[in-house]
Protein backbone atom coordinates (compact mmCIF):
# COMPACT_ATOMS: atom_id res chain seq x y z
CA UNK A 1 0.00 0.00 0.00
CA UNK A 2 2.84 2.38 0.83
CA UNK A 3 4.42 1.66 -2.54
CA UNK A 4 1.16 2.53 -4.32
CA UNK A 5 0.91 5.84 -2.45
CA UNK A 6 4.53 6.63 -3.26
CA UNK A 7 4.05 5.85 -6.97
CA UNK A 8 0.87 7.93 -7.08
CA UNK A 9 2.71 10.83 -5.44
CA UNK A 10 5.57 10.57 -7.94
CA UNK A 11 3.08 10.48 -10.81
CA UNK A 12 1.31 13.59 -9.53
CA UNK A 13 4.64 15.41 -9.19
CA UNK A 14 5.60 14.37 -12.72
CA UNK A 15 2.32 15.66 -14.14
CA UNK A 16 2.62 18.96 -12.26
CA UNK A 17 6.20 19.42 -13.43
CA UNK A 18 5.23 18.83 -17.06
CA UNK A 19 2.16 21.07 -17.09
CA UNK A 20 4.40 24.04 -17.73
CA UNK A 21 5.67 22.64 -21.02
CA UNK A 22 2.34 21.49 -22.41
CA UNK A 23 -0.41 23.48 -24.03
CA UNK A 24 -3.61 22.77 -25.93
CA UNK A 25 -6.32 24.57 -27.82
CA UNK A 26 -9.36 24.79 -25.59
CA UNK A 27 -11.83 26.68 -27.76
CA UNK A 28 -12.59 25.54 -31.30
CA UNK A 29 -14.07 27.89 -33.86
CA UNK A 30 -16.37 26.36 -36.48
CA UNK A 31 -15.83 29.35 -38.80
CA UNK A 32 -12.25 28.94 -40.02
CA UNK A 33 -13.22 28.77 -43.68
CA UNK A 34 -10.14 27.42 -45.42
CA UNK A 35 -8.52 26.87 -42.05
CA UNK A 36 -5.44 28.27 -40.43
CA UNK A 37 -3.39 25.24 -41.35
CA UNK A 38 -4.08 25.34 -45.07
CA UNK A 39 -1.30 27.08 -46.92
CA UNK A 40 -0.91 27.72 -50.58
CA UNK A 41 -0.36 24.55 -52.55
CA UNK A 42 2.57 25.90 -54.57
CA UNK A 43 4.77 26.36 -51.49
CA UNK A 44 4.68 22.62 -50.76
CA UNK A 45 5.65 21.50 -54.24
CA UNK A 46 8.35 18.84 -54.12
CA UNK A 47 11.03 18.83 -56.76
CA UNK A 48 11.16 15.32 -58.25
CA UNK A 49 14.84 15.63 -59.11
CA UNK A 50 15.76 16.51 -55.53
CA UNK A 51 13.71 13.60 -54.19
CA UNK A 52 15.45 11.25 -56.64
CA UNK A 53 18.85 12.48 -55.43
CA UNK A 54 17.88 11.92 -51.81
CA UNK A 55 16.60 8.44 -52.68
CA UNK A 56 19.86 7.53 -54.43
CA UNK A 57 21.86 8.88 -51.48
CA UNK A 58 19.86 6.73 -49.05
CA UNK A 59 20.31 3.67 -51.26
CA UNK A 60 24.08 4.22 -51.29
CA UNK A 61 24.20 4.61 -47.52
CA UNK A 62 22.10 1.49 -47.09
CA UNK A 63 24.48 -0.48 -49.31
CA UNK A 64 27.51 0.74 -47.33
CA UNK A 65 25.81 -0.13 -44.06
CA UNK A 66 24.96 -3.60 -45.34
CA UNK A 67 28.55 -4.18 -46.43
CA UNK A 68 29.96 -3.05 -43.11
CA UNK A 69 27.60 -5.39 -41.24
CA UNK A 70 28.66 -8.32 -43.43
CA UNK A 71 32.37 -7.64 -42.86
CA UNK A 72 32.00 -7.18 -39.11
CA UNK A 73 30.73 -10.74 -38.60
Curated annotation (Swiss-Prot):
Organism domain of life: Eukaryota
Annotated signal peptide: 1-24
UniProt modification remark: Contains 1 disulfide bond.
Tissue/organ expression: Expressed by the venom gland.
GO CC terms in record: extracellular region
Cited Pfam families: Adipokin_hormo (PF06377)
Keyword terms of this UniProt record: Disulfide bond, Secreted, Signal, Toxin
Keyword Disulfide bond belongs to the record: yes
UniProt-listed PROSITE patterns: AKH
Subcellular location: Secreted
A molecular function (GO) term: toxin activity
InterPro entries: Adipokinetic_hormone_CS, AKH/RPCH_hormone
Keyword Lipid metabolism: no
Family recorded in the similarity comment: Belongs to the scoloptoxin-22 family.
Name of this chain's protein: U-scoloptoxin(22)-Cw1a
Organism: Cormocephalus westwoodi (Westwood's green centipede)
Amino acid sequence: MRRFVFLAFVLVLFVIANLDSSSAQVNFSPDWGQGKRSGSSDTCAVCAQTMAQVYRLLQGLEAKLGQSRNYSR
